[in-house]
Amino acid sequence: VYNAIVLMKIIGRPTWWTILLFIPIINLIMFPVIWIETLRSFGKRSALDTFLGLITLGFYIYYINYTQDLEYVADRSLSPDSKTADTISSLLFAVVVATLVHTYLIQPYTIPTSSLEKSLLVGDFLFVSKMNYGARVPMATIALPMVHDSIPFTKSKSYLTWPQLPYMRLPGIQNINRTDIVAFNWPVDTVYRFFDTSKRRAYKPVDKKSNYVKRCVGIPGDSLSIKDGLIYIDGKLLQLPERAKPQFSYKVA
């Protein structure tokens, strides 16, 4: 951490950037930025230097360090050199902020099933707060930001299955209560491909499994039973919201 703070001072960037280097997914964007900023701090500002720094995953910095006599540019301009560079910098900043919000604060979802049709309809768009119950730290550390399990318009995975972080969740501001509507990932270990008779299975990290939205009716420690279509918790009838109550009679015209 100390080395990262010193590096931020060398490249003339704020020390709080160090935090971004340790946030999964965000760090995949920040590391290339740091490589480029380090090169420019020693006068390497050409497009070729930038390309070599990116294509070698930063090892180009080690190469020029031992093969060239470089001078540190202490008073370099931190502003982009051109309108194109300014646009790229703005886009990167927007992606970093959006990924932070998307991963740890609020995420948009689309309702995939009709099980909550009295409250939510299939195809409805909604925003889900991750702060209330505590955001889960991404387990797939190498993945494209702002997408789920596949790259749009392709059938390719948007992530690598290795390396993976263990399951970890940040502290929340409230506990899950009965009758809360919650978004979660499909909990089973493997997923069968829909409409595929070959019984092939898709193995995914927990955070890349399909998103589902359901109503919570039981919490840890509850004794749950269903009698005549009604839910009982610890022997008492669960009081559901009006739109969540079972319907036993229908009017037929």
Task: Go through each PLM region and give its residues.
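Internal/C-terminal transmembrane anchor helices
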Residues: 78-106
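A structural motif detector for short, solvent-exposed N-terminal "entry" segments of globular domains
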Residues: 90, 112-113, 220
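Conserved AWS/pre-SET-to-SET junction and N-terminal core of the SET lysine methyltransferase domain
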Residues: 104-110, 204-205
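Membrane-interface helix-boundary signature
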Residues: 10, 14-17, 82-92, 173
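Alpha-helical transmembrane signal-anchor/signal-peptide segments
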Residues: 107-126
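N-terminal signal-anchor transmembrane helix
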Residues: 74-81, 114-116
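Membrane-cytosol interface at the C-terminal ends of transmembrane alpha helices
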Residues: 1-73, 105
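Soluble "head" domains of membrane/secretory-pathway proteins
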Residues: 122-253
